[in-house]
């Protein structure tokens, strides 16, 4: 069963009623890579290993679930209702929704042991993996087998902007510094095209993809780099009329939101959670109604599927530190 309403859940969540266990450092650790000092990666798959000592595992009676704040969290609580019921049935646990208001808040919640299952946006996934012990398990898959989305640069249909070069001197909405399609990828890709954000055009952080999109619709911004999937869902919900926006540029695909678990959940519980994802039937579900292009949850590999995202982040000078996470939190909010 699941526990409404969102406001009450948020209060309970914040005062720490959710059962949590402190993250324990793996010691000694011969291989860590980019992971925070509290984690270890002995098997070399780039994600945190489960603690060898079962005393370091957390097995709460209530599992807390969150979805990336690409839009208002309230939009998705109802959409994930069917899935959370399915998750409760397969795990035998109570499921509580956590309405994360920023990427940083979501990462910090898992790092502190207060969040156990999450859908994390593509860009922040690397922060969640390295700072919070997040282990990506599945992603939403289309009928054609793809799990990706693209970076789209959108502008109003009446705008004179036709190319990336036309962004010079304009007011452009970026999402937040941790967003792959909303900031990190544009900075790397646009510079290669001869246009440097902050130098050639004014960057205005909107905080969320929907804010950027509606800002362009309402002509508060001249353009915005955003995730194609968010544009598609908002148009399908009637948030703006077809033809209102024009796509100036579209990238090759990136992996979409990673769904996964805290690294220190017991192995049998992690397996039950994975099975809840892969056995969920999107047909006639609220989740299927919201994500109309999705057929199922499919297994993923952070090491493989996030290779290009990590490359762009490294080339952009991104480092996965608590200090940078705090900066992202302030920007995102």
Predicted regions and their residues:
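Alpha-to-beta junction loops
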Residues: 111-120, 133-134, 170-172, 217-226
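Ligand-binding "clamshell"
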Residues: 128-140, 234-248
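Pocket-flanking alpha-helical
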Residues: 98-133, 231-236
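N-terminal hydrophobic or amphipathic helices and topogenic motifs
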Residues: 21-105, 289-333
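Short helix-initiation/N-cap motifs at beta->coil->alpha
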Residues: 97-108, 197-214, 253-255
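Bacterial N-terminal signal peptides
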Residues: 9-19
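Periplasmic-binding protein-like
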Residues: 68, 143-152, 239-277, 281, ...
